[in-house]
Amino acid sequence: MKQQGMTLLEVMVALVIFALAGLTVLKTTAQQANGLGRLEEKTFALWIAENQQAAMRLEKQWPQSQWVDGEVNFAGSLWFWRIQGIATADTRVRAIDVEVRHDRDSRAADAVLRSYLVQPGEPAQ
């Protein structure tokens, strides 16, 4: 007699294989969603850092050598930034370091950005 269909064991093995494949797809999707959230957070932090540096340039502020901190409401969240001026070999030029954190107490910054500023009123050579 010829067998038609699948045995119960074959059906159960097939179900296990499909279940494992489904879990793998679900896990990958969850990781991608988490990664997108982190990417969005890092992008916002970089925008805030760029905004702080642009504000210093527009206001023609000379960056202080100690950390100056503040906070800003951005994209519906409270963010914490701090800026420090760092001396360079040329006394008319300072490096500006900006760190941005979503959590004030976080040891690691969400974004760190460095740029350089020529002292206001001094011609660059």
From Swiss-Prot:
Residues 1-5 form a propeptide. Keywords: Cell inner membrane, Cell membrane, Membrane, Methylation, Protein transport, Transmembrane, Transmembrane helix, Transport. The chain crosses the membrane at residues 6-26. Belongs to the GSP I family. InterPro entries: N_methyl_site (IPR012902), Pilin-like (IPR045584), T2SS_GspI_C (IPR003413), T2SS_protein-GspI (IPR010052). Cleaved by prepilin peptidase. Methylated by prepilin peptidase at the amino group of the N-terminal methionine once the leader sequence is cleaved by prepilin peptidase. This is Type II secretion system protein I. It is found in: Cell inner membrane. One of its GO terms (biological process) is protein secretion by the type II secretion system. Type II secretion is composed of four main components: the outer membrane complex, the inner membrane complex, the cytoplasmic secretion ATPase and the periplasm-spanning pseudopilus. Interacts with core component OutG. The keyword Transferase does not apply. It comes from the Bacteria. The keyword Protein transport applies. The modification N-methylmethionine is found at M6. One of its GO terms (cellular component) is type II protein secretion system complex. It comes from Dickeya chrysanthemi (Pectobacterium chrysanthemi). Gene3D superfamilies: GSPII I/J protein-like. NCBIfam families: gspI, IV_pilin_GFxxxE. It holds the Pfam family N_methyl. It is a single-pass membrane protein. Component of the type II secretion system required for the energy-dependent secretion of extracellular factors such as proteases and toxins from the periplasm. Part of the pseudopilus tip complex that is critical for the recognition and binding of secretion substrates.
